[in-house]
Design a protein with these regions (language model features):
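N-terminal leader segment of winged-helix/HTH proteins
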Residues: 1-31
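Alpha-helical linker/hinge and terminal dimerization helices associated
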Residues: 13-20, 24, 101, 105-117, ...
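A cross-family signal for key residues in well-ordered alpha-helices
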Residues: 14, 42-43, 58, 103, ...
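Charged, amphipathic alpha-helical coiled-coil/dimerization segments
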Residues: 72-130
């Protein structure tokens, strides 16, 4: 494939990803919600109370350090409680203050996301998901190959 065509594809996809990021930034700042807190709190909502920090890292694709520091911040602000499970696991539970924060800030943002997706016909949504999955898989494969070449 000619480099120019690839550059245009790359510029196009990176532009769209930047635009999505900008929209999220605007939405999160309108509620004064830091991105890490949004991701962790929405993960707790998805996974259910009693979930583990490890599960949040795995499903959110945030690194463990980011999840850990966000969990500590949420605990300090009394939005969550950590309860010991089988060592070394700590189960995460929302406090009343955390549930209120979730209701007032996190759920409305998720509802905005959901409404945008509801406007897409199912066939377009499936095409979007399939295309995105293919791009992610291809990208991951080439990153792995790049890393393998650079190990030598």
């Amino acid at each position: 494939m000619p480099a120019m065509m690839t550059d245009n594809k790359l510029r196009h996809i990176n532009g769209m990803l930047s635009e999505i990021s900008s929209i999220y930034e605007k939405l999160l700042s309108s509620r004064n919600v830091p991105e890490g807190i949004f991701i962790v709190m929405s993960s707790i909502l998805d996974l259910g109370e009693g979930c583990l920090q490890k599960e949040i890292s795995e499903t959110s694709y945030l690194n463990k350090k980011t999840v850990n520091s966000t969990i500590k911040k949420l605990e300090k602000e009394e939005f969550i409680l950590l309860k010991a499970g089988k060592y070394p696991n700590m189960h995460i539970y929302l406090t009343d203050k955390g549930r209120e924060y979730m209701k007032e800030n996190i759920i409305p943002i998720i509802e905005v996301e959901s409404k945008a997706l509801e406007l897409m016909p199912p066939s377009e949504f499936e095409t979007l998901v399939e295309s995105y999955r293919k791009y992610i898989d291809n990208f991951r494969e080439h990153v792995d190959m790049f890393e393998e070449r650079n190990k030598k």
